[in-house]
Amino acid sequence: MSPPNCLLAVLALTVFIGANNALPITSRPIEGNVQRMVWEDWVNLDPEQRNLTKEKKITAKSIFTLPFRHCPQGHTLFNQLCIPQSNIDPTDLVKQELILAGGSNGSPPPPPIGDYDYGDDEESEEIVYDLSVIPTAMQDGLPPSVGTGDQALPSEDAPLKFNIFEKKFPTGTGEHEEMPLPPDMAAATYAKNISTTPETSTSITPTSTTTFAVPSVPSGEASNRIPGGVDLLAAPSDAFSTSTTLSMPTSNTTTTSNKDIGQVESIVLPADQEHDGLVHLVTSSLSDNDSDDSSTTLNGFNAEADLAQLLKVDAFWPVYDGSIELLPPLFSHRKVAPPLSADQDVKTKHAVDAAEKVGAELEEEVGEEEVTATDILPSEEDEYTTETATTTGDTTVAEASMDTSTATSTSGQSSPHPPEEPEIDERENRLVLIKSKVQPVQLTTTTSATATTAADVANSSSSTDRFHYQHFVEDESSTTTATPEPSSSTPGDPIEQSDMPASDNDNLMTNTIGGRGDDDDDGGHKATSEIHVQQELRLINELVKGKQRQQHQPQKQQLEPTSTEITSALTSTSTEDATTTTTTTTAYTNWSKVMPQLGQSTSETAATTETVATSGQVNEISLTATSASTEVKHFSITNRSYRNSKIIREDRLTVEPEGIVESAASTESAGTAATTPNSSSNPDGYTPLWWLPSIGWRLDRHLDGNGEDQSLLLRFFSTFRGSNTAATTR
């Protein structure tokens, strides 16, 4: 056990010696000669000085402090240097000003001397004067020195002294600051200083040179003026009491902000000036103004707060000077386009006539039976446009007059429109989808067999087309029109209008008048894009109704259900041959711009149905069940064409009625005979997906354990041979 003890003793001595000569554990590399010298002094200290406790001893932390931390008297620490400090007496500055001003005897100022310096090592650029030449009487008259006390820097260990509650508890001036009064008290105080003479009073709005004389204003409403000349545009949040009394030759209208806000009828803004904060609220003159002002002081503050929200200046001032409200509408003799909202009801002719009658009466009675709020600014009568808000009974009609012509807005519509917005394609055109009605099926007798051919379908009128073309210039509505003339149009006929010339400005309100001029006629001239779209739609309608036959391309054919109900007498036995032409829809691979073409292929199948009449009711029930079952089967097998991968194809029906096996077998044989040439074109049994055209590429189906298609991602590959169908299309 002795050798390990010896090793431990040697290791302890080595660590003790190394600790005396090495850096502290928490030290950093020595930077600079000063720190190195301090560290050497620390190492060379004797143990007695290191163990001093009463005096300030040197520790390892001292080497990381700046040298000359405690500068001698009259020096200041700056940039690791002790700079001599010279305290300037404030009286010296006063003496210099007196020397520059000159002595009392009118002698010139003495020449500057260089014995007064501020302590800079370099040459000072300041001018120093000799203070000995100042008269003694002048020195005695100087004020006593201020601030000549202790200007020494605070102690290095003293905490910083500053008031963090300066705003809440100010310590600077010591003067009493007057607290602002609440708005309601301020309004009540301001009301006491207003003259209450009932004869006449004058109200002057701020930032405006116009003075309005108001006769016979009650004293209770004089307190509603703006207190203290508050600018509404500069401080809208503080405008709690806003009122302006107006005087007009027809009626005296006085506004009060303590009343209900619902009485506000219009807001008058100056039209031809800059933003001067002049906002006027014109309320109804029928309101009760006889109430005492003291009764409304309780709920006045809430009403004023709501009115302040209503009077947000940025909500009423336009963004730029050429605003929407100030531009006159462009009236012209144009037809009116359908309005923007398609949910309005079509007005009757009686309503339009009544509106025109009201407009004619308004033109005669302007200025007689109405409360009018016009612009305050002076304007000439015939050269400028004045906007007038006219109130007659329950109807509010906006009237805009330019020179001598007056137009009245009516709510009548020009033409009936569909209740739903039609779809819009990329050329701003509308595709109106007209719902087709289901025609009733007529029952056939035993002596007549109905044969539906493609020629009969082609003879149908154009009014049964499912797609119609309607060309609209813009989405425009009429808000201000001049005697709209109704146009007669049916939903089946396309609405044809010529392009309206664009207006000079981009005003939203003035461009709402759409349509075309009275002198402009179509004349059959249409744009090329319009003709192309009409040709496409006509082609689609012909293909849907079976006007084109394309039998050169074999595809899978569909047998539409043919329900033949045979009514026979109870005592007779009849055998007839019913020749039925089945029209099937085939999807081809030459695709058009709008939708894939649909061709019609016909296949005539002769189905011989023998019925032995034992009971007429039994025959009808069995044959009706046969037609229903075959319809469900063929519809579910071939019509969907794998449009949904989760629909599993079934080859035959699981349950068939026993009494109709013969009829169903004949129908199935006809179906297999029709699909035989198509199935021979794909010997490997490949069935293309409905969305994949025959372009030489094929996509095999991979089924998982559940019988569903696997992921279609990255499973395209080319066989470079194509099918017979793809070869014929190339």
UniProtKB/Swiss-Prot annotation:
InterPro entries assigned to the protein according to its UniProt record, in alphabetical order: FOG_N (IPR031761)
Annotated Polar residues bias: 504-513
Positions with biased composition (Low complexity): 197-211, 386-415, 478-491, 567-583, 663-676
PTM text: May be highly O-glycosylated in its Ser/Thr-rich C-terminal part.
Cysteines engaged in disulfide bonds, as pairs: none
Keywords: Cell shape, Developmental protein, Extracellular matrix, Gastrulation, Glycoprotein, Secreted, Signal
Induction of the gene: Controlled by zygotic patterning genes.
Glycosylation sites recorded in the entry for this protein: N51, N193, N252, N289, N459, N590, N639, N678
Purpose: Coordinates cell shape changes during formation of the ventral furrow and invagination of the posterior midgut primordium, by inducing apical constriction of cells in spatially and temporally defined manners. Could function as a secreted signal to initiate apical constriction by acting as a ligand for an unidentified G protein-coupled receptor, which in turn activates the G protein alpha subunit encoded by concertina, in neighboring cells. Such an intracellular pathway would ultimately induce contraction of the apical actin-myosin network.
Official protein name in the record: Protein folded gastrulation
